[in-house]
Swiss-Prot record:
PANTHER family, alphabetized: OROTIDINE 5'-PHOSPHATE DECARBOXYLASE
Classification via Pfam families: OMPdecase
InterPro entries: Aldolase_TIM, OMPdecase, OMPdecase_AS, OMPdeCOase_dom, RibuloseP-bd_barrel
One of the GO biological process terms: 'de novo' UMP biosynthetic process
Domain of life the protein comes from: Eukaryota
Similarity-based family: Belongs to the OMP decarboxylase family.
Alphabetical UniProt keywords: Decarboxylase, Lyase, Pyrimidine biosynthesis
Assigned EC number: 4.1.1.23
Protein name per the record: Orotidine 5'-phosphate decarboxylase
């Protein structure tokens, strides 16, 4: 694969290009998955690992004390401070009109703050169209927003969409999962990739264990289930090593409990995974 920088310079998606540029600038292909249940835990962990990641993945609906002002706004401030994209792991799976409102409206208003989200392919192309509509409507409403908040961020060029960037959001399709017994394999994975081709501007890539072979599109591949120590858990999660997933075409490794579970030091572990991910990338691209 070409380098992150080379891909960013020619990428069809302005959003994907910004992600690749940030990865290259920070020298980190690590996404921290912060599956915690309180705002305090989420914000504290995000602040600790923020300098070492390109992205933070959330499950915002498991936050017991969620409020938009108390949870989302501090998280957005940390994204600007440390330079990372926000990825709400919502796994949308309904018809187009429903997912549009799940994405844009309700308590969480995901489209307002989450740079990237994901969806199952089961409902067909309607789910992509619905989420795109939610993104376009939200971004259109935000065009009038004051961007002065970004002025003091050294990561402004990566995090702030250009004026002509119509979507300013990205969607990942769930092509493969890391849990034991997953049905997202084989023909299902192939059909999901075909669905993504219906809108390569908005669908920027996949949650997958491998890069699609022989595909001419430059998809972003994000891989969960990455661990340097553990092999799995009692609930079916299976872990692969950093070098293993990078060798099969991953762009960004997703690590959760490996950073903060079992009384681990999240700062030291984030540094460790950042180093491992970047070294594995350099081995492939040197």
């Amino acid at each position: 694969m070409p380098s992150y920088e080379a891909r960013a310079n020619v990428h069809k998606s302005a959003f994907a290009a910004r992600v690749l540029k940030l990865v290259a600038a920070k020298k980190t292909n690590l996404c921290a998955s912060l599956d915690v249940t309180t705002t305090k835990e989420l914000i504290e962990l995000a602040d600790k690992v923020g300098p070492y990641v390109c992205m933070i993945k959330t499950h915002i609906d498991i936050i017991d004390d969620f409020t938009y002002a108390g949870t989302v706004l501090p998280l957005k401030e940390l994204a600007l401070k440390h330079g990372f994209f926000l990825f709400e792991d919502r796994k949308f799976a309904d018809i187009g009109n429903t997912v549009k409102h799940q994405y844009k409206n309700g308590v969480y208003r995901i489209a307002e703050w989450s740079d990237i989200t994901n969806a199952h392919g089961v409902p067909g192309t309607g789910i992509i169209a619905g989420l795109r509509a939610g993104a376009e409507e939200t971004v259109s409403e935000q065009k009038k927003e004051d961007v002065s908040d970004y002025e003091n961020s050294q990561y402004k060029e990566f995090l702030v969409p250009s004026p002509n960037e119509k979507l300013a959001r990205g969607l990942l399709m769930l092509a493969e999962l890391s849990c034991k017994g997953s049905l997202a394999t084989g023909e299902y994975s192939k059909q999901t990739i075909e669905l993504a081709r219906s809108d390569p501007e908005f669908v920027v890539g996949f949650i997958a264990q491998n890069r699609p072979k022989g595909d001419s599109e430059d998809w972003l591949i994000l891989t969960p289930g990455v661990g340097l120590d553990d092999k799995g858990d009692a609930l079916g999660q299976q872990y692969r090593t950093v070098e293993d997933v990078m060798s099969t075409g991953t762009d960004i490794i997703i690590v959760g409990r490996g950073l903060y579970g079992q009384n681990r030091d999240p700062i030291e572990e984030a540094k460790r995974y950042q180093k491992a991910g970047w070294e594995a990338y350099q081995k492939i691209n040197c």
